């Protein structure tokens, strides 16, 4: 058997998350079904599991296929079976593990105050976010290594809630005619819905609905003020570092 590394992008609006679902509407279901159609029976491992509605620009996968498959041939037959909501960007032979070998993961969150067309609603979150300076002040609180037990949704399977965030900042840019604030958060790994809870905390601070002290209390597992993640549609798994 040969191990393959695949880099994919997908539209999270069409799936119930990355992980396999009973109704077969997970991204993993789509990929494994496409591989099965080619006679390849393999569990597909992803660098990170995204929730329902969350997108990926460069999700990385690892899986095994029979030795008669090479990267060029498999790409040719697999890519059309994944389109249009999953795009196979790159495929190469590589002996590695997509999740365990990943060193860093980068997420981006897109937020605009005024969405001018409904056609972008699944891809850019809409809502007030206050000031850019306040957002960056809040984001700085999260850098470093912390126990993120109070920044995760229930159901995330993990025995170690400690994670390191290497960089977290926000900036403004224009995306398809919309002024957006983009949150960029890079860490070694993330707990379930952790990024969305972090962004929500920063937005609520910027809107003067919570204080920095409340954010710090939640980071240190003293008291949880933010319990509901910000909407999923603005979040993208942007890059995985190896």
Curated annotation (Swiss-Prot):
Keywords: Isomerase, tRNA processing. Its EC number is 5.4.99.12. It catalyses: uridine(38/39/40) in tRNA = pseudouridine(38/39/40) in tRNA. One of its GO terms (biological process) is tRNA pseudouridine synthesis. The active site is at 51 (nucleophile). Substrate binds at residue 107. InterPro entries: PsdUridine_synth_cat_dom_sf, PsdUridine_synth_TruA, PsdUridine_synth_TruA_a/b_dom, PsdUridine_synth_TruA_C, TruA/RsuA/RluB/E/F_N. It is an enzyme of class 5 (isomerase). GO terms for molecular function: RNA binding; tRNA pseudouridine(38-40) synthase activity. Formation of pseudouridine at positions 38, 39 and 40 in the anticodon stem and loop of transfer RNAs. Belongs to the tRNA pseudouridine synthase TruA family. Homodimer. This is tRNA pseudouridine synthase A. It comes from Helicobacter pylori (strain Shi470).
């Amino acid at each position: 058997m040969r191990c393959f590394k695949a880099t994919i992008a997908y539209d999270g609006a069409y799936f119930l998350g990355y992980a396999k679902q009973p109704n077969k509407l997970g991204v993993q279901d789509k990929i494994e079904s496409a591989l099965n159609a080619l006679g390849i029976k393999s569990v597909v491992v992803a660098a990170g599991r995204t929730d329902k509605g969350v997108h990926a620009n460069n999700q990385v996968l690892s899986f095994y296929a029979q030795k008669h498959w090479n990267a060029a041939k498999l790409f040719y037959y697999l890519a059309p079976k994944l389109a249009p909501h999953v795009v196979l960007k790159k495929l190469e032979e590589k002996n590695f593990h997509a999740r365990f070998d990943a060193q860093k993961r980068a997420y981006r969150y897109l937020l605009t105050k005024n969405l001018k067309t409904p056609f972008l609603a699944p891809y850019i979150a809409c809502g007030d976010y206050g000031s850019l300076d306040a957002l960056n002040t809040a984001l700085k609180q999260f850098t470093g290594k912390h126990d993120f037990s109070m920044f995760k949704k229930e159901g995330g399977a993990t025995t170690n809630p400690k994670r390191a965030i290497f960089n977290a900042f926000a900036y403004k840019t224009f995306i398809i005619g919309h002024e957006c604030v983009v949150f960029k958060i890079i860490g070694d790994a993330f707990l379930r819905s952790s990024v969305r809870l972090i962004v929500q905390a920063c937005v609520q601070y910027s809107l003067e609905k919570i204080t920095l002290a409340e954010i710090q209390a939640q980071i240190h597992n003293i008291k949880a003020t933010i319990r509901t993640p910000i909407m999923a549609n603005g979040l993208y798994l942007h890059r995985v570092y190896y």
